[in-house]
A protein has these predicted regions:
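Conserved glycine-bearing catalytic or ligand-binding loops at nucleotide- and phosphate-handling centers
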Residues: 53-62, 128-131, 287-293
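Gly/Ser-rich oxyanion-binding loop with an adjacent helix/lid
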Residues: 108-163
């Protein structure tokens, strides 16, 4: 694949998406850049589905000392274990991505974001969400993208919202809001603030949703240049007669159970409904389709 680069400016800051030059053995690889902060995000999926009742997705965020122009101290001169910040960043990338994969997709997927350069001004975490989304789509993995992530700060003096603020802008802000999602839906919210009103928080979320749409639109243009080949998969879906039988007999009961305000009573009610629905199936059906029931 030839090198493809998409450089754009949004909300007063310049970004770059690039693929085709690094990590060519990965299913999809995108270098995302804001200022001089650069993160390489790779996405790879197994060819065969795993025999499991869950989606085996692994997301990792790798911090490297060389990104800040440093060499690890100590005798071995080796990188240490992942920091708490790296672990939290990996989880932040995982949350919006996980819900965007096709139902019944059981192939193992690995997303690795490696910070190659940290310019001490722009933060690498939220742009990694956009990089992960672009890498997954470049790999042709069944993923309902594009998705993006934005950090919203607010200028205390003017009241203006700032998209993906620098460290300096964030320190002077009374709001630190991270939002992940698509152009028309929010998938993840993480926030900290100094007594920001509910009205201001809702305004910030609406502003974040508009910003997400802008970043998703750029990814669409980027993907058109790449034109990836969709991955051939076989979804692990429950037989239709099972879903019809469960929905017909248990939809209303489960709805009532889930709306019980008492936590322990709610858990008991949900367990009782599940046990009742399980009795709808014969022993032979339970043995054959147990993971769907």
């Amino acid at each position: 694949m030839a090198k493809i680069t998409e450089t754009f400016e949004l909300f007063g800051k310049q970004y770059t998406l690039e693929t085709g030059e690094m990590a060519k053995q990965a299913g999809g690889a995108v270098l995302v850049r804001q200022g001089d902060t650069m993160v390489l995000v790779t996405a790879t999926a197994s060819k065969e589905a795993k025999d499991a009742d869950f989606f085996p997705l692994t997301v990792d965020f790798e911090e490297r000392m060389y990104a800040a122009g440093k060499i690890p101290g100590g005798f071995l001169k080796r990188e240490g274990r992942a920091s708490e910040k790296a672990t939290l960043t990996a989880r932040m990338i995982d949350r919006p991505l996980r819900s965007a994969f096709a139902d019944g997709f059981r192939n193992e997927v690995q997303v690795v974001a490696t910070c190659l350069s940290a310019d001490q001004h722009n933060q690498p975490d939220v742009i990694s969400i956009m990089g992960a989304s672009a890498a997954l789509m470049c790999a042709g993995i069944p993923f309902e993208g594009p998705l993006a992530g934005v950090r919203i700060a607010r200028n205390v003096d003017t009241g203006e919202y700032i998209v993906n603020p620098t460290f300096e802008e964030e320190e002077a802000s009374d709001l630190d809001l991270i939002v992940g999602g698509s152009e028309d839906a929010i998938y993840m919210i993480e926030a900290g603030a100094q007594e920001v009103s509910e009205e201001d928080m809702l305004d910030a979320l609406m502003f974040a949703q508009k910003a997400l749409g802008e970043f998703c639109e750029v990814q669409k243009r980027f993907l058109q240049e790449i034109n990836p080949t969709p991955m051939e998969i076989k979804l692990d879906e429950a037989p239709e007669f099972i879903t019809e039988r469960i929905f017909a007999a248990g939809k209303e009961k489960m709805y009532e159970a889930l709306h019980n305000a008492d936590k322990h009573a709610r858990m008991d009610d949900v367990a009782a409904v599940k046990a009742e629905l399980k009795e709808l199936f014969t022993e032979e059906e339970q043995a054959q389709y147990g993971k769907y029931i």
